[in-house]
């Protein structure tokens, strides 16, 4: 219904319309959905991909909304489940790094760690904004059942 209502020249929901090669025809739509969802403390879920046997196409289209911050995408067929989990779950290295940021920030903002607000974790400065971003990645990883492969060790004075 949506594709027809905006008169988009395409028969495939979610794919770029023929002749539109200058960007993403859906960027404004996806960002509008995402901002509305976040404004109302709701999850942003991308719509269906009807070509149920085209798993690579599903991943490509899902990757677009995942990159923007969507929480997931409709799954119409069991063959799309693993693809959705792969696309919307963080990579192991990102999950581990998020957990390290959280542990390091907790330590360095504590009295034992010097009660500081911004600190270095290796070559990276971390602060409250870093902590908030890490919370998002960490929560997604935990929801996906990920286990950490690295641990934070406070420096020995």
Question: What residue ranges belong to the model's regions?
Answer:
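Expand to "…catalyze enediolate/carbanion chemistry for C-C bond making/breaking, isomerization
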Residues: 1-157
């Amino acid at each position: 219904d949506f594709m027809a209502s905006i008169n988009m020249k395409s028969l495939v929901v979610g794919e770029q319309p023929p002749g539109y090669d200058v960007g993403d025809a859906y960027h404004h739509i996806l960002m509008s959905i995402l901002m509305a969802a976040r404004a109302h403390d709701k999850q942003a879920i991308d719509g269906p991909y009807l070509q149920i046997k085209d798993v690579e196409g599903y991943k490509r289209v899902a990757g677009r909304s995942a990159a923007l911050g969507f929480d997931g995408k409709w799954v119409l067929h069991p063959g799309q489940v693993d693809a959705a989990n792969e696309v919307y779950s963080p990579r192991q290295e990102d999950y581990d790094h998020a957990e390290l940021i959280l542990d390091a920030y907790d330590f360095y903002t504590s009295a034992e760690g010097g009660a500081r607000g911004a600190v270095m974790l290796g070559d990276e400065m971390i602060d409250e904004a870093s902590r908030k971003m890490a919370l998002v990645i960490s929560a997604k990883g935990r929801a996906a059942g990920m286990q950490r492969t690295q641990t934070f060790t406070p420096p020995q004075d």
